[in-house]
Each structure stands twice: as structure tokens, then as C-alpha cells.
Curated annotation (Swiss-Prot):
NCBIfam families: gatA. This is Glutamyl-tRNA(Gln) amidotransferase subunit A. Belongs to the amidase family. GatA subfamily. One of its GO terms (cellular component) is glutamyl-tRNA(Gln) amidotransferase complex. The keyword Nucleotide-binding applies. It catalyses: L-glutamyl-tRNA(Gln) + L-glutamine + ATP + H2O = L-glutaminyl-tRNA(Gln) + L-glutamate + ADP + phosphate + H(+). Heterotrimer of A, B and C subunits. The lineage of its organism: Bacteria, Fusobacteriati, Fusobacteriota, Fusobacteriia, Fusobacteriales. The active site is at K82 (charge relay system), S157 (charge relay system), S181 (acyl-ester intermediate). Allows the formation of correctly charged Gln-tRNA(Gln) through the transamidation of misacylated Glu-tRNA(Gln) in organisms which lack glutaminyl-tRNA synthetase. The reaction takes place in the presence of glutamine and ATP through an activated gamma-phospho-Glu-tRNA(Gln). PANTHER family: GLUTAMYL-TRNA(GLN) AMIDOTRANSFERASE SUBUNIT A, TRANSAMIDASE. Disulfide bonds: none annotated. It comes from Fusobacterium nucleatum subsp. nucleatum (strain ATCC 25586 / DSM 15643 / BCRC 10681 / CIP 101130 / JCM 8532 / KCTC 2640 / LMG 13131 / VPI 4355). InterPro entries: Amidase (IPR000120), Amidase_CS (IPR020556), Amidase_dom (IPR023631), AS_sf (IPR036928), GatA (IPR004412). Keywords: ATP-binding, Ligase, Nucleotide-binding, Protein biosynthesis.
Length: 487
């Protein structure tokens, strides 16, 4: 490829040009801010930018290079982070009115790791409020548009993160994935979205939605860029007891590998009525390409898939209602003005501070945890979650990876008024990976009506390497999508 603009380069290419003295960090960062200035009014990926600070950090990095000091693994790479990942001194709102003026008092572990490796954080991206949604329309700040069609949603909840990469405003964005919030927007926006195994990346500093499901993920233009970022953000953390102590491999060693003999499973339950036939064609084309690369493809069964959506929408709201109890108008965040006593302070603050979707999920969560319904809903959902997990364990003993669609439809219009149930059903193909705690990656597989469509690979827990290997092989076989110019 011939690049006329720096923003078209991948993170790997930018880093190489920085390390070889071909480009300065200041030039790189400036070029991305120029791109943001040009397209941000159309897309609205960001809720805040840190231009002065980022340029200052870039100049310091140039000085570091000039002095011959050791440079980090992400030196010179601009990165964006989702608005629910804390950064010291930076406004972090989770795109909610209740936190509209909250300033982070410490760095999330992933942010700390990025900074230690000389990445430059250029801005904070838009999202659905408290990561609850699949459109980025529930954000308190504004709606984000899909760079492929400005009248369509970018997906959610990490819609701003996906749109920022697709609009080439940044080469890598960090998001969070509780039920598909990295992979679905990656599919809608034609970029790569990676959700690691639960416990592979620290959640310290991630605003909690559903603590047993949340995982920080990465969005980028290429699988290689995902591998480079994962090398930095994965691994043990003293501040998060759920992080595995398993050694983190060098994910870049699994790029450019032969996948001959790999066994891929296609779950029959994922190719159902309601799946756009043209999306099935995209998956079929990927299957054909994988067979040409020497992989073996077999049909498999994940029998409890039909229970995944109801299970998720009992467990996730239950955890959310508990996690969001801390936003009460007393400790921090928004506080209602007209109240008469403590109870009215709580009620008014939470009624005014939370949006409709968040309130809906708090109510669902409170209901399923209440004394009369705990056994009927929450306890039963936990049992079904175990069955879903067992389905994955059984199947992943027979095959190396599972291949599925990411979403049953292409990006829908911003003007579409889908019911909450219709939106919840959009998560059918992504939430099982969170319920089972397995890693998953969404890779652009092709176009349907000039809109991008992703394919999803899921693998064994803590075997991110095989997903990097197979997604990279498929990406190189079918080629990358040409991202929209937005001129």
C-alpha cells in the first residue's frame, strides 16, 4: 500500500518509523489530531481530547529517543481509551450524567501499562452509558456515527472506540466487553475487536458494570496491532485478584503462521432463523478461505445457546444493580438539588442522574435479586451459565477454535427505534463468550450492502495465541477492508 497520510499507517508501521528516526512522535501525534479535526464533527467518536498533554508527552518521547534512552514497546503509538477506563487527572464519566464532572484520581492498570511502554493517549471515546447498550445512543454526551454510513450506529457499547479506529482517528483503541461490547462494534465498523479471556487483562480502574463478565479489550486495524497491544496490557496485577498468574506469551510470535490441520467448529445453533442470509454468506466465504489454508471445518453443537440471552439479562443486570448502588449523590458524582431527606436525595439523584437503559437494568437486577425471585431467576441463571460453560469445554476438547457470525445484522440506522428486547437479541452470538469466560476475536469478513460484517473466533481459556494465529492467517488470505476516507 502507498500511504499519503500518516493516519493510514498501522500501529506497527508507526512504531517502526518512529524507532528508525523516520518520524518523530510529535509528527505522528499531530497528524492524528489533524485527522480528528477533519472528521470528528461527522463521527463524534470522542468525548474529550488531551491534545496539549499528548503533544507534550510526544516531545518528551522525542527527547528520550534523541538521548539514546530505552524506548517502550508502544513508543510513538497514539491510543484512545473508552470513557469507563480511569486516567488520573482526566474526566471519566462512563458517559453518564451521574459522573459528568468526575475526574479520575488514579490510572487504571491498563493505562499505567500503556504509559510505561511510551504509548500516547490522545483522547477518551464515547460509549453507551455505563457500557449498557449496543448502539452508543445511550451516551449522556452525544450519539456517534458509523464511519461507513453516517446515518447508522457504530454499535456498542464501545461504539466510539470502534468508530475512532474505522475513521482512522487513532490506530488502536481500548474498549470493554461485557457481552460483545468490543466485538459487535468492531463488526459494524469493519475493524478487528479482541476480547481476551476473563482474567487475562486487569480490570483495575475499569468502572464496573458486571464484574464476572467485564473484560478490557482492544480494537485496531490489524490482528498484528492487537497482538502488539496485548503484549503490553495482559498479565498479572496486584490490584485485581481475578487476574491469572499464567505467563503471558509474546503474541506477535503467532503471526504469519501456518494453520494447516487446525480444526474449526461451526455451531449449528448460531446459523438460525433471524440471521441475515448475506451475513451467512460472509461466514461461508471465510470457511472456504480457511479450508484453502488447510484447516479442517466440522459442525458442532452448543446446545444451551438458546438460553444465553435470558441468562445474560438476568446475571448482568443483577451485578449492575449491585455495582451501581455506589452512585448515590453522597460519595461522588451528581447530586440532586431539591431534596427533603436522605431517601429523597437517593431517589432524585439516581432518577435524574441515570439514563433510561441504566435504570431499566438496575430495576431488572434488583427484581431478580429480591427475596421472592432470587431462586427463580438469579440462582437458575447461574446454573444455566455453568451449562453454557460446560458446552464450551466439551466442544473445545474436540476442536481448536469455534467460528461464528458476530451479529445477526449489519449496523442499523440511527433513526431505528428497536425495542429493548430486539436490542438484547442482537447480542445472541457474542454473550456466550462472556458467560463462558473464553477469549474471542471479531475480524472483518466482508461487506453486505457496502457495510462491514465481522466473523468471530472463540477459543479455549488463556489460549489467545490460537485466535491471533487463525485471525491473522484469515486476514492475510482475504485481505483487509479499505476503511472509509470521509473526505
Amino acid at each position: 500500500m502507498v500511504y499519503n497520510n500518516l493516519y493510514e499507517l498501522t500501529a506497527k508501521e508507526l512504531r517502526d518509523k518512529f524507532l528508525s528516526n523516520e518520524l518523530s512522535a510529535e509528527e505522528i501525534v499531530n497528524s492524528f489530531y489533524e485527522r480528528i479535526e477533519k472528521v470528528e464533527d461527522k463521527i463524534k467518536s470522542f468525548v474529550s481530547l488531551r491534545k496539549d498533554k499528548a503533544l507534550d508527552e510526544a516531545r518528551k518521547l522525542d527527547e528520550k529517543r534523541k538521548n539514546g534512552e530505552k524506548l517502550g514497546r508502544l513508543a510513538g503509538i497514539p491510543i484512545a481509551i473508552k470513557d469507563n477506563i480511569l486516567m488520573e487527572g482526566q474526566k471519566s464519566t462512563s458517559c453518564s450524567k451521574i459522573l459528568e464532572n468526575y475526574i479520575g484520581i488514579y490510572d487504571a492498570t491498563v493505562v499505567k501499562k500503556l504509559k510505561e511502554e511510551d504509548a500516547i493517549i490522545i483522547g477518551i471515546t464515547n460509549m453507551d452509558e455505563f457500557a449498557m447498550g449496543s448502539t452508543t445512543k445511550t451516551s449522556f454526551h452525544h450519539k456517534t456515527s458509523n464511519p461507513w454510513d453516517l446515518n447508522r450506529v457504530p454499535g456498542g457499547s464501545s461504539g466510539g472506540a470502534a468508530a475512532s479506529v474505522a475513521a482512522q482517528e487513532v490506530p488502536i483503541s481500548l474498549g470493554s466487553d461485557t457481552g460483545g461490547s468490543v466485538r459487535q462494534p468492531a463488526s459494524f465498523c469493519g475493524v478487528v475487536g479482541f476480547k481476551p479471556t476473563y482474567g487475562r487483562v486487569s480490570r483495575y480502574g475499569l468502572m464496573a458494570f458486571a464484574s464476572s463478565l467485564d473484560q478490557i479489550g482492544t480494537l485496531a486495524k490489524t490482528v498484528e496491532d492487537i497482538a502488539i497491544c496485548m503484549n503490553v496490557i495482559a498479565g498479572v496485577d496486584d490490584y485485581d485478584a481475578t487476574v491469572s498468574k499464567k505467563e503471558v506469551p509474546d503474541y506477535t510470535e503467532f503471526l504469519n503462521k501456518d494453520i494447516k490441520g487446525l480444526k474449526i467448529g461451526l455451531p449449528k445453533e448460531y446459523f438460525i432463523e433471524g440471521l441475515n442470509p448475506e451475513i451467512k454468506n460472509v461466514v461461508d466465504n471465510s470457511v472456504k478461505a480457511l479450508k484453502e489454508l488447510g484447516a479442517e471445518v466440522v459442525e458442532i453443537s452448543l446446545p444451551h445457546t438458546k438460553y444465553a440471552v435470558p441468562t445474560y439479562y438476568v446475571l448482568a443486570p443483577a451485578e449492575a444493580s449491585s455495582n451501581l448502588a455506589r452512585f448515590d449523590g453522597i460519595r461522588y458524582g451528581y447530586r440532586a438539588k431539591d431534596y427533603t431527606d436522605l431517601e429523597s436525595l437517593y431517589v432524585k439523584t439516581r432518577s435524574e442522574g441515570f439514563g433510561a437503559e441504566v435504570k431499566r437494568r438496575i430495576m431488572i437486577g434488583t427484581y431478580v435479586l429480591s427475596a421472592g425471585f432470587y431462586d427463580a431467576y438469579f440462582k437458575k441463571a447461574q446454573k444455566v451459565r455453568t451449562l453454557i460453560k460446560q458446552d464450551f469445554e466439551n466442544v473445545l476438547n474436540e476442536v481448536d477454535v469455534i467460528l461464528t457470525p458476530v451479529a445477526p445484522s449489519v449496523a442499523f440506522k440511527l433513526s431505528d427505534t428497536k425495542t429493548p428486547i430486539e436490542l438484547y437479541l442482537e447480542d445472541i452470538f457474542t454473550i456466550s463468550a462472556n458467560l463462558a469466560g473464553v477469549p474471542a476475536i471479531s475480524l472483518p469478513g466482508g461487506l453486505v450492502d457496502n457495510l462491514p460484517v465481522g466473523v468471530q473466533f472463540m477459543g479455549k481459556p488463556f489460549d489467545e495465541e490460537i485466535l491471533i494465529k487463525i485471525a491473522d492467517a484469515l486476514e492475510k488470505k482475504i485481505g483487509r477492508l479499505n476503511l472509509p476516507k470521509l473526505d
